[in-house]
Swiss-Prot record:
Keyword Nucleotide-binding listed: no
Molecular function terms from GO: aminoglycoside 3-N-acetyltransferase activity
Gene behind the chain: aacC4
Gene Ontology annotations of biological process type: response to antibiotic
Cysteine disulfide links: none
Entry function: Resistance to antibiotics containing the 2-deoxy-streptamine ring including gentamicin, kanamycin, tobramycin, neomycin and apramycin.
Keywords: Acyltransferase, Antibiotic resistance, Plasmid, Transferase
Similarity comment: Belongs to the antibiotic N-acetyltransferase family.
Catalyzed reactions: a 2-deoxystreptamine antibiotic + acetyl-CoA = an N(3)-acetyl-2-deoxystreptamine antibiotic + CoA + H(+)
Name used for this protein in its record: Aminoglycoside N(3)-acetyltransferase IV
InterPro entries assigned: Amioglycoside_AcTrfase, Antibiotic_NAT-like
Keyword set includes Ligase: no
Length: 261
């Protein structure tokens, strides 16, 4: 039977990893990798908030993934692939949540500034919660997940003006009516986001260590973006899969593939 980590131990691990008290922390997590621990997902959230302290702001992804249904920040559950920690977080008292389908949730002094922008299109554009974390010089914690879950790399793609996109849509309520909104998203399988692991480690920009039973990575958002922009400046298609018949392919989460020559 695996050891059950106590919250006090998790707080120590987070601080040893380099979480900044009073800072902004964007967390992508897999509770399955972290567990078992005292008080389950809630215990992990409490440990994260304790490590940040009262002056810190905790941020998590909180979108529903339901393209054909309007988003309600008070009731819409998160898409299952974001995990139980994210789905627990937005339901807690004093947690603020974006009022659009590409929502993030946040708690702390900077929460309103991070989540209050209107619908960002594409979702991780320079007017998105991910971008606000970047502007506030926040950190990104990948807790039991890899860079394929790192939404800050999508921000870097858009800042680099990558020449690819996938047709997407979402549904909003406008004057009491359902309205479909179409847009292009820099969405793909994200497998090659794993390249960022080596880039950041080579520059000693990525801190690594255990949190609970999980392997954790901690990086400044600005370091992620600056490093990715440097690589995308040399090869705008570096996050796409290698050429197949002279073309670079986006392996997408949907049946749609968009090809870039």
């Amino acid at each position: 039977m695996q050891y059950e980590w106590r919250k006090a131990e998790l707080i120590g691990q987070l601080l040893n990893l380099g979480v900044t008290p009073g800072g902004v922390l964007l967390v992508h997590s897999s509770f399955r990798s972290v567990r078992p621990l005292e008080d389950g997902p809630l215990g992990l959230i409490e440990a994260l908030r304790a490590a940040l302290g009262p002056g810190g702001t905790l941020v998590m992804p909180s979108w529903s993934g339901l393209d054909d249904e309007p988003f309600d920040p008070a009731t819409s559950p998160v898409t299952p692939d974001l995990g139980v920690v994210s789905d627990t977080f937005w339901r807690l008292p004093n947690v603020k949540r974006s009022a659009h389908p590409f929502a993030f949730a946040a708690a702390g002094p900077q929460a309103e500034q991070i989540i209050s922008d209107p619908l960002p299109l594409p979702p991780h554009s320079p007017a998105s919660p991910v971008a606000r974390v970047h502007e506030l010089d926040g950190q990104v914690l990948l807790l039991g997940v890899g860079h394929d879950a790192n939404t800050t790399l999508h921000l870097a793609e858009l800042m680099a003006k990558v020449p690819y996109g996938v047709p997407r849509h979402c549904t909003i309520l406008q004057d009491g009516k359902l309205v479909r909104v179409d847009y292009l998203e820099n969405d793909h399988c994200c497998e090659r986001f794993a390249l960022a692991d080596r880039w950041l480690k080579e520059k000693s920009l990525q801190k690594e260590g255990p949190v609970g039973h999980a392997f954790a990575r901690l990086i400044r958002s600005r370091d992620i973006v600056a490093t990715a922009l440097g690589q995308l400046g040399r090869d705008p298609l570096i996050f796409l899969h290698p050429p197949e018949g002279g073309m670079r392919r986006m392996r997408c989460r949907s049946p749609v593939d968009w090809l870039s020559s």
